[in-house]
Design a protein with these regions (language model features):
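Conserved beta-strand scaffold positions in the cores of enzyme catalytic domains, especially
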Residues: 27-31, 114-118, 175-178
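Conserved segment of the helicase C-terminal RecA-like domain
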Residues: 142-155
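ATP-dependent small-molecule kinase phosphotransfer cores
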Residues: 25-96
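Glycine-rich loops and low-complexity Gly/Arg-rich segments
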Residues: 24-27, 53-56, 122-126, 140-145
Length: 189
């Protein structure tokens, strides 16, 4: 499961878990971001130099440069290699493994999965989720100050998501598309 920034796959994974219980199947949910991304401090060291932090130059802390390294540039190489081995090792008869995370369908990882699903939502819904504290920037454990979280999204998180989504559609990768504007009314296409 991959998706646009702030995609919420929790309900979807829980529904799959419920169906697995009814069918007598096991379920393992694997957080690809926790398994592959660099630490928040390491990602900050990559992104912060692209943002202007001097309030004398930029009083509103609005300006910066777009990060162009994609999700791949935010991933820890050793952790990603371990993840590439762990996912196939998790396959067992009578068990379903669900991998979720931003960038989990990048070319380097997509062959690990049998079914590829992309969660999409409108930018407005994404911003509302950020403002409600429902999103932490890539590599972060908790939401930060709203304006800084949004700023980081504009220059990094949104950019990674848009480029990833473009590549996925260009190559006809997703098997399923989920409209995630309303987690209580997911639309699977």
């Amino acid at each position: 499961l991959d998706g646009y920034t702030t995609a919420n796959w929790t309900v979807f994974v829980n529904l799959i878990a419920r169906e697995c219980c009814l069918q007598g199947l096991g379920l393992e949910a694997i957080d690809a971001n926790a398994a592959t991304l660099k630490s928040g401090k390491e990602i900050d060291a990559i992104i912060d130099p692209l943002l202007i932090w001097d309030t004398k130059i930029d009083p509103t802390l609005l300006y910066g440069k777009v990060y162009k390294g994609g999700y791949q540039g935010l991933m820890d190489e050793a952790r990603t290699e371990a993840f590439k081995k762990a996912v196939p090792a998790s396959r067992q008869a009578g068990k379903i493994s669900v991998v979720y995370g931003y960038g989990s369908l990048i070319p380097e990882l997509r062959e690990l999965y049998d079914v590829k699903v992309f969660f999409d939502l409108t930018p407005m819904k994404s911003m509302l989720r950020i403002r409600r504290g429902e999103y932490s920037n890539l590599g972060k454990e908790r939401p930060g100050i709203i304006n800084r979280t949004i700023r980081r999204c504009y220059y990094c998180d949104f950019e990674c998501a848009v480029r990833n989504r473009h590549e996925l559609w260009e190559n006809n990768v997703p098997d399923w598309y989920v409209l995630d504007n309303d987690p209580q009314n997911l639309q699977l296409m």
